[in-house]
């Protein structure tokens, strides 16, 4: 959802929009809570409060002020990620299609012939990283830029088996315009920029993908693990093949291949030396992608090529000779992409020339690596019978046409390793069947606890990582942020097919622990000053964000809060339910409380916990177990709102109701989740029951509207099991709440048979006070309350009577006493 604060005169009618007027009788948090549970996607917030807007943004709900119609229009019609600290709106909006325009953040693409193969009359526009160059398109009080591009379509094409680009593009556009936009993919690009800028220097980054190829250039101190190394020694496993030479792309993507090769070498250098290297490139022209590289960091780049390399710092318009290796300095990488043009030469002659050039390239690599220190080389080679260092790394990024070439990354240590003879056919097998798809070339990270800070976004759920080891990791890892795929199934599957592999599934209760926040994407990014206009949906591809040793763990009213916890419930309640009170009635009935009068006011069950359980697929931004843990330890820091501390019985009753709900729905996953939360509550609270009580709270009244035959009709305000040391504390507590108790609006409306022989009158208005009293006794370790549901009533007779109904009658308290059972001992309160 999104909240747009505005003047009353700007309010207009839009689809899926509701107006909320600030309620001056409620505080900021209560107003924010009410707004967050509105079911409309757009909320127009009139007579707004800045404090309410801040609360909503910190809860992950994008909330902005619109001061005119233009701002209102752009905020209503677009979805976005909002930096509420810097006041930047990152739009995720494809409306530029009505300009007959595709967009890219890759400058090199605009220098190719791609426009010959896109829709007639269309053009490709470069917008810079995160659409930075679109800022000039918007003139609002907030900074605004559009991050949407079509690079995902182009990349999918590059890695597909399709050659004709236009049909591929049309199909992709049709899909984009008829299905839900991949919103979190767009928003994640912004989030990663913010996250990586804040991680410590000892960070381990597990599973980065090409989406971060430019983002992570700023952080050489981060160690990346992508589990994608293919070594020369791995070629021996391949069946030998022949040259195919297949077309891969209609437009020229040679620069893409070169860009990825150089980036792969840079990141290999980062992992090894954690510093920025000087970059040498041989055969560099035209390398327009250097433009984007230099926007991120001012690399020292020196190049050699007879043709121009526009963005090189020092370009030598000449061929590089072997003797020139003496000019190359330490702390550098060398990219060798030398190959002369065929120019119609006979294929045998051409083949011999290519093999000779490969030998020269490898000699340049050898001489470069043998001199100095802290050097890494990426060298072009052709498929041929040759010896190479066994541990060197092979790359084969897509290019316009699959030829006989690939690339090898070699370090100074690899050069000293044993050599492995590789036949030509093994190279062809690698080239024909492999498209390297990740510039973060690195080994597998073995999932085990470490003292370092770990970032693992969307990379640990796959079947390569043992599920039990991952759960153990979540319980022992001290620092970091990881994601795991949430179990959204209904039959409690432990894994689910995802693309070509399986993902293991996890429930929040399996990974929760002290100090760890478990939340949704929008819940986590709010701690990085970001909020979203589009909440998480229960798509089946939802991820738990698990933040270890989070400094915000105790900030229960600031981050990952209960905001929006009833939104799904409201949606069902007002559109599908038998009555708008269905939820209240269901919760009471399933726990044996059959007095449904004022059930929405005097409910025996925690509605918060119930909603968090039954709609956990929608509400997992709210970290329920963290909430329970902080309450159990009495460490809740409340900043505002109508705070009510739930007693553990209310939490357990919520679990009971949720369990019945789950069984009615045949939701096996929810059954498991509810049972695990129930166990968690029992573990966190030291519950003792007065099932064999020796004292009770005796409340009698001035007058009763019903006839009675018992000598002393009264309300039992609670049963206790006290030792001699507890009595004075109990009296002190009761006297401290005496005025509150007397002020209660206690009512009675009917009589009923509590058992076959006990005739009672109901008492309304006491139950919520009972739970407040429960917590006061619990904090003092005084045993109060029984294991069964507490039903406030007055015993009238011990024989069967006919039930009576009357108008609600107020009960006036006459006296309050603490009495010992089967004794004359009593203490007046």
Swiss-Prot record:
Q: Name where it mostly resides.
A: virion
Q: Where is this region: 2'-O-methyltransferase activity?
A: 243-425
Q: Which InterPro entries match?
A: VP3_Rotav (IPR011181)
Can you quote a single GO CC term? viral nucleocapsid
Which keywords describe this protein according to UniProt? Answer: GTP-binding, Host-virus interaction, Hydrolase, Inhibition of host innate immune response by virus, Methyltransferase, mRNA capping, mRNA processing, Multifunctional enzyme, Nucleotide-binding, Nucleotidyltransferase, RNA-binding, S-adenosyl-L-methionine, Transferase, Viral immunoevasion, Virion
Q: What does UniProt list as catalytic?
A: 714, 716, 793, 795
Question: Where in or outside the cell?
Answer: Virion
Domain of life where this protein originates: Viruses
Reaction(s) catalysed by this chain, per the record, are:
a 5'-end diphospho-ribonucleoside in mRNA + GTP + H(+) = a 5'-end (5'-triphosphoguanosine)-ribonucleoside in mRNA + diphosphate; a 5'-end (5'-triphosphoguanosine)-ribonucleoside in mRNA + S-adenosyl-L-methionine = a 5'-end (N(7)-methyl 5'-triphosphoguanosine)-ribonucleoside in mRNA + S-adenosyl-L-homocysteine; 5'-triphosphoadenylyl-(2'->5')-adenylyl-(2'->5')-adenosine + 2 H2O = 2 AMP + ATP + 2 H(+)
- One MF annotation (Gene Ontology) recorded for this entry: RNA binding
PROSITE patterns for the chain: SAM_MT56_VP3 (PS51589)
User: Which EC number(s) are documented for this chain?
Assistant: 3.1.4.-, 2.7.7.50, 2.1.1.56
The cross-references to Pfam families, in alphabetical order and at most eight, read: Rotavirus_VP3
Q: How does it assemble?
A: Interacts with VP1. Interacts with VP2.
| Record note on domains | Contains a bipartite N7-methyltransferase domain, a 2'-O-methyltransferase domain and a GTase/RTPase domain. The C-terminus contains a phosphodiesterase domain that degrades the 5'-triphosphorylated, 2'-5' linked adenylate oligomers produced by the host cell in response to IFN stimulation.
What family does this belong to? Belongs to the rotavirus VP3 family.
- UniProt protein name: Protein VP3
């Amino acid at each position: 959802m999104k909240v747009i604060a505005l003047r009353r005169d700007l309010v207009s009618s839009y689809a899926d929009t509701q107006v909320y007027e600030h309620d001056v009788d409620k505080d900021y948090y209560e107003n924010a809570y009410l707004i967050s549970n509105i079911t409309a996607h757009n909320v127009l917030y009139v007579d707004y409060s800045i404090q309410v807007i801040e609360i909503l943004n910190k809860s992950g709900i994008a909330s902005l002020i619109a001061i005119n119609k233009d701002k209102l229009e752009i905020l209503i019609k677009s979805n976005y990620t909002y930096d509420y600290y810097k006041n930047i709106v990152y739009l995720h909006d494809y409306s530029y299609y009505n300009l007959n325009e595709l967009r890219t953040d890759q400058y090199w693409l605009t220098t190719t012939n791609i426009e010959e193969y896109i829709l007639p009359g269309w053009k490709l526009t470069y917008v810079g990283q995160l659409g930075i160059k679109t800022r000039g398109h918007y003139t609002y009080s907030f900074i605004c830029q559009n991050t949407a591009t079509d690079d995902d379509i182009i990349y999918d094409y590059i890695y597909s088996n399709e050659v004709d680009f236009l049909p591929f593009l049309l199909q992709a556009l049709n899909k984009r315009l008829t299905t839900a936009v991949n919103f979190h993919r767009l928003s994640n690009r912004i989030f990663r920029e913010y996250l990586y800028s804040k991680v410590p220097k000892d960070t381990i980054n597990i599973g980065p993908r090409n989406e971060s190829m430019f983002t992570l250039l700023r952080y050489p101190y981060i160690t990346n693990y992508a589990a994608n190394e293919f070594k020369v020694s791995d070629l021996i496993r391949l069946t030998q093949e022949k040259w195919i030479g297949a077309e891969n792309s209609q437009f020229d993507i040679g620069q893409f291949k070169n860009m990825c090769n150089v980036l792969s070498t840079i990141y290999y250098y980062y992992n090894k030396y954690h510093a920025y290297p000087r970059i040498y490139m041989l055969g560099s022209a035209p390398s327009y992608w250097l433009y984007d590289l230099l926007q991120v960091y001012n690399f020292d780049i020196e190049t050699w090529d007879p043709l121009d390399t526009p963005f090189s710092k020092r370009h030598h318009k000449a061929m590089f000779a072997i003797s020139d290796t003496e000019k190359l300095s330490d702390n550098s990488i060398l990219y060798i992409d030398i190959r002369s043009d065929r120019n119609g030469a006979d294929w045998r002659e051409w083949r011999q020339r290519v093999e000779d050039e490969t030998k020269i390239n490898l000699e340049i690599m050898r001489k470069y690596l043998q001199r100095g220190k802290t050097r890494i080389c990426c060298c072009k080679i052709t498929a041929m019978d040759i010896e190479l260092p066994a541990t060197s790394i092979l790359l084969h990024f897509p290019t316009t046409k699959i030829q006989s070439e690939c690339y090898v990354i070699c370090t100074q240590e690899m050069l000293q390793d044993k050599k492995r003879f590789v036949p030509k056919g093994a190279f062809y097998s690698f080239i024909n069947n492999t498209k390297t798809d990740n510039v973060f070339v690195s080994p597998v990270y073995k999932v085990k606890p470490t003292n370092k800070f770990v970032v693992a976004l969307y990379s640990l759920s796959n079947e390569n990582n043992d599920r039990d080891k991952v759960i153990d990791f979540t319980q022992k890892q001290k620092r970091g942020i990881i994601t795991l795929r949430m179990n959204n199934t209904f039959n409690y599957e432990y894994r689910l097919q995802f693309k070509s592999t399986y993902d293991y599934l996890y429930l929040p209760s399996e990974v929760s622990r002290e100090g760890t926040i478990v939340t949704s994407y929008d819940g986590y990014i709010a701690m990085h000053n970001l909020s979203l206009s589009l909440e998480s949906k229960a798509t089946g591809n939802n991820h738990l964000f698990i933040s270890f040793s989070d400094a915000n763990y105790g900030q229960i009213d600031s981050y990952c809060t209960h905001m929006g916890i009833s939104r799904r419930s409201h949606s069902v309640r007002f559109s599908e339910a038998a009555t708008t009170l269905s939820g209240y009635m269901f919760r009471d009935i399933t726990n044996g409380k059959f007095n449904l009068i004022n059930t929405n006011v005097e409910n025996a069950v925690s509605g918060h916990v119930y909603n968090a359980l039954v709609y956990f697929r929608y509400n997992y931004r709210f970290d329920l177990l963290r909430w329970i843990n902080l309450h159990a330890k009495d460490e809740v820091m409340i900043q505002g709102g109508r705070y009510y501390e739930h007693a553990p019985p209310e939490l357990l009753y919520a679990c009971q109701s949720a369990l019945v709900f789950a069984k009615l729905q045949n939701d096996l996953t929810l059954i498991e989740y509810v049972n695990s939360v129930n166990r968690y509550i029992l573990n966190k609270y030291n519950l003792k029951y007065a099932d064999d009580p020796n004292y009770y709270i005796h409340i009698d009244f001035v007058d009763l509207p019903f006839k009675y035959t018992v000598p002393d009709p009264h309300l039992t305000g609670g049963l206790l099991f006290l030792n001699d040391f507890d009595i004075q504390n109990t009296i002190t507590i009761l006297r401290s709440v005496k005025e509150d108790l007397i002020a209660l609006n206690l009512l009675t409306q009917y009589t009923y048979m509590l058992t076959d022989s006990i005739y009672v009158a109901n008492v309304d208005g006491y139950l919520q006070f009972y739970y407040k009293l429960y917590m006061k006794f619990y904090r003092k370790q005084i045993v109060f309350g029984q294991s069964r549901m507490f039903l406030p009533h007055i015993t009238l007779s011990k024989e069967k009577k006919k039930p009576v109904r009357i108008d609600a009658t107020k009960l006036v308290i006459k006296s309050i006493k603490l009495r010992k059972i089967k004794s004359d001992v009593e203490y007046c309160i």
